Amino acid sequence: MEMVLPVANATAAALARVSAMFNAPLARAVVFGIHIDGHLVVEGLLIAAILFQLSRKSYKPPKKPLTEREVDELCDEWQPEPLCPPIKEGARIEAPTLESAAGPHTIVDGKEVVNFASANYLGLIGNEKILDSCIGSVEKYGVGSCGPRGFYGTIDVHLDCETKIAKFLGTQDSILYSYGISTIFSVIPAFCKKGDIIVADEGVHWAVQNGLQLSRSTVVYFKHNDMASLASTLEKLTHGNKRTEKIRRYIVVEAIYQNSGQIAPLDEIVRLKEKYRFRVILEESHSFGVLGKSGRGLAEHYGVPIEKIDIITAGMGNALATDGGFCTGSIRVVDHQRLSSSGYVFSASLPPYLASAAISAVDHLEENPSVLANLRSNITLLHKELSDVQGLEIASNILSPIVFLKLKTSTGSAVADLELLEVISEKVLKEDSVFIAATKRSSLDKCRLPVGIRLFVSAGHTESDILKVSESLKRVAASVL
């Protein structure tokens, strides 16, 4: 400040002197009887100079055409940027090749293996009743639907499937999507727009992350499955902030987290939702057909009225042994998607035989509730057998069909951790014919939860299958870790 004041004062004094000089009697002139001050003369000259510059033609240097030799040299020197960045060695994926259906037992690279790498929770892959329904549907409708739902792609079996799912879950209506992961990342942007607030779990999988990004909403993450962190986040966003009262607000969670096998505490989430007036989007790809007394998902598991969940989505490729996905809820929620959800509007509809398979799978679940008891028995047995694996610990919930093993002591680097886990997976497959997989994540995946080995338990696994994978993991982990 001490330096600025003298400079400012000196500048003001200089301007005053210049102004006084131009307004002095000697600087005044009389033209045609009109008194003209000196500063008007200066301003007139400036205007004349500006007009002169604007009226001049722009200067263009003479162009000399390049010779053919110069053109060739420039072409030879040009180095185009690569279409995509080079793949790092650690990012290369050499996945085993399956040569049969991905049931409890499958063939990998010509060898029969026990399969714990595919989500086939109810063991319905290869089910005769489902296969017969698919064959009948192909004979009646053909293989594909040949168009989006709004353009001659709606077939009666699609409507039957939507009605079946809504009736099974006790919701007003449902809507089918042609691809599992496109369901959630189409539904989120259909409802969440720029300026809205989304509070999401930091452990959500890539498809949910993609939906959050496409929505262009303001996204705030809370600690993985931590209700204290969720409550704190909601409080910070709403306390004393009148702006948040006027915009849409959502909580986005998974029922069973693909990246950890943890189960979301829905009762507490609903309590916080009602307290802070948020809406809930629940992703149930790994809980539909699994959790609850009759497999109706997380709401049945916690005894929460399903009407309290605003939007529910799920893929049908995990429990129902088919493909595609669905969103269910109120009639208003479903109707909005028929014109606003990109995955529904712009994609060819679900092949009719896959919709028939979904209907048959739900029928099978209703007629054979014992399949859930078999699944839970297998999960419990696997947890018991893997409780003392050297260097590994179970991070998943006891009721989750995803049994997630992570390192007890991390190396400090996710890349190094993954390399160790991949070595274990490869040795288990090569030496004991047990197919398991480590959790690979792309550079676009924002999830920062620990990597691990993910085992998908099926009701179709036998006790000997469970014991085999347990013994193999114990032996290999002891030799590697």
Curated annotation (Swiss-Prot):
Mind listing the GO biological process terms from this record? ceramide biosynthetic process; sphingosine biosynthetic process
Q: Which residues cross the membrane?
A: 32-52
In the record, the note on similarity to other proteins reads:
Belongs to the class-II pyridoxal-phosphate-dependent aminotransferase family.
- Can you name the source organism? Oryza sativa subsp. japonica (Rice)
- Entry EC no(s): 2.3.1.50
Top EC category? transferase
What does the protein in this record do?
Serine palmitoyltransferase (SPT). The heterodimer formed with LCB2 constitutes the catalytic core.
Name of the protein described by the UniProt record? Long chain base biosynthesis protein 1b
Q: How does it sit in the membrane?
A: Single-pass membrane protein
Instruction: Check the UniProt entry and state the signal peptide residues, or none.
Output: none
Q: Name one GO cellular component term.
A: endoplasmic reticulum
Quick one: which pathway? Lipid metabolism; sphingolipid metabolism
Give the lineage.
Eukaryota, Viridiplantae, Streptophyta, Embryophyta, Tracheophyta
